């Protein structure tokens, strides 16, 4: 008789503990249901990157002195700098400069260590192409003026969406 009561008591404790775990799971689920969604409608809405965002590299050909510091500080020796030495003025003359964004890890070392500030990071993050060889940008493509998300009239700019705390659903537009 006592074995039956102890097994019944154990069963009740385990059932109560299981109900508690299920209640905790539902609590987390309902908590997340009241938060703002993280996803956006991409082609029609685009995120505005932060100021420190490291996107496509912009290159200014006229400022470059062909010192190759960018190549030396790059962890994968990525920038290809082609130059000629002019004996008359005893100076390097830059012929071409290219970066393959299919290999680039966007660490920003080249931008940080450039002595003439001819390299800068832009807020462009749409670099998708059908052929990976199109990701090899020469100095002409790198010198293209970066486009801003805010300037596009067909797109609704969205400020950065972080993981929002509780009660932020009511602030949706």
UniProtKB/Swiss-Prot annotation:
Domain 4Fe-4S ferredoxin-type: 55-84, 95-124
Binding of [4Fe-4S] cluster 2, residues: 74, 104, 107, 110
Matching PROSITE patterns: 4FE4S_FER_1, 4FE4S_FER_2
Note accompanying the cofactor annotation: Binds 2 [4Fe-4S] clusters per subunit.
Gene Ontology biological process terms, A to Z: photosynthesis, light reaction
Known EC number: 7.1.1.-
InterPro entries per UniProt: 4Fe4S_Fe-S-bd, 4Fe4S_Fe_S_CS, NADH_quinone_OxRdtase_chainI, NDHI
One protein family per Pfam: Fer4_7
Membrane topology designation: Peripheral membrane protein
Domain of life where this protein originates: Eukaryota
Annotated catalysed reactions: a plastoquinone + NADH + (n+1) H(+)(in) = a plastoquinol + NAD(+) + n H(+)(out); a plastoquinone + NADPH + (n+1) H(+)(in) = a plastoquinol + NADP(+) + n H(+)(out)
Binding site for [4Fe-4S] cluster 1: 64, 67, 70, 114
GO cellular component: chloroplast thylakoid membrane
Subunit structure: NDH is composed of at least 16 different subunits, 5 of which are encoded in the nucleus.
Function text: NDH shuttles electrons from NAD(P)H:plastoquinone, via FMN and iron-sulfur (Fe-S) centers, to quinones in the photosynthetic chain and possibly in a chloroplast respiratory chain. The immediate electron acceptor for the enzyme in this species is believed to be plastoquinone. Couples the redox reaction to proton translocation, and thus conserves the redox energy in a proton gradient.
Protein family per UniProt: Belongs to the complex I 23 kDa subunit family.
Name of this chain's protein: NAD(P)H-quinone oxidoreductase subunit I, chloroplastic
Organism of this sequence: Nephroselmis olivacea (Green alga)
Gene name, Swiss-Prot/TrEMBL: ndhI
